[in-house]
Every structure is written in structure tokens, then in C-alpha cells.
């Protein structure tokens, strides 16, 4: 197995990712007041060649002190977006990345 820190690059923090965490925390800060899901979900940036089982093993190895168990992993490849650089004179692209939405069993969380 690869080094777990080569597979999991970092925690992904956006409004949608935080909304997923709040839904699993049961704080009711989702789209509908009082909405929640049973299992905690977190979003991570992962390596492009990472597979779902490899992501699950890496997270369980990184958070071995919290004794987490991964229930499921969903992955999304985000395509590079067009961008302009140097005051709009040159065209380029942002770098694409792969993100993983990881669902943990109820009672197990990394947060």
C-alpha cells in the first residue's frame, strides 16, 4: 500500500462540504430546517490514481487513533476550468483534481 498521506492530500473545505458535515452532525443547518443524515460525511482531495478501497484504507490508517470505520467512498474527477492569466492576456487552465466524499459509520467521525 502507498503512504496514506500520498493518497489523501488534504481536507476539502467549501460551503457544500461544510453543509454535508452539518447535516451529519444533526445541527439542522442544511437546505431544510431540521434536516440531517445518520452517517457522518467528509470531503477530501485525493490523488488522481487513488481507488475507492485505497482511499478507505488510507483514511483508516491516518485516523487509527480515532478508530474510524469507512462505510462508503464516492469519488469525483473535477475537470480543469479555463482561466486567464497575466491581466487577461494569456489563456490557461486551472489544474483538475479528484475529490472523495467519504461516509463513515454512525458514531465514527474525523471531526
From Swiss-Prot:
One of its GO terms (cellular component) is ribonucleoprotein complex. GO terms for molecular function: rRNA binding; structural constituent of ribosome. SUPFAM superfamilies: Ribosomal proteins S24e, L23 and L15e. Coiled coil: none annotated. NCBIfam families: PRK05738.2-2. One of the early assembly proteins it binds 23S rRNA. One of the proteins that surrounds the polypeptide exit tunnel on the outside of the ribosome. Forms the main docking site for trigger factor binding to the ribosome. Part of the 50S ribosomal subunit. Contacts protein L29, and trigger factor when it is bound to the ribosome. Belongs to the universal ribosomal protein uL23 family. This is Large ribosomal subunit protein uL23. It comes from Chlamydia pneumoniae. The lineage of its organism: Bacteria, Pseudomonadati, Chlamydiota, Chlamydiia, Chlamydiales. The gene is rplW.
Amino acid at each position: 500500500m502507498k503512504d496514506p498521506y500520498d493518497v489523501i492530500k488534504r481536507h476539502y473545505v467549501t460551503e457544500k462540504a461544510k453543509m454535508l458535515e452539518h447535516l451529519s452532525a444533526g445541527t439542522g443547518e442544511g437546505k431544510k430546517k431540521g434536516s440531517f443524515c445518520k452517517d457522518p460525511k467528509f470531503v477530501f482531495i485525493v490523488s488522481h490514481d487513488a481507488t475507492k478501497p485505497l482511499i478507505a484504507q488510507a483514511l483508516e490508517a491516518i485516523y487509527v487513533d480515532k478508530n474510524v470505520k469507512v462505510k462508503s467512498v464516492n469519488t469525483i474527477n473535477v475537470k480543469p476550468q479555463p482561466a486567464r492569466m497575466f491581466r487577461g492576456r494569456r489563456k490557461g487552465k486551472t489544474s483538475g483534481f479528484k475529490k472523495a466524499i467519504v461516509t463513515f459509520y454512525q458514531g465514527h467521525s474525523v471531526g
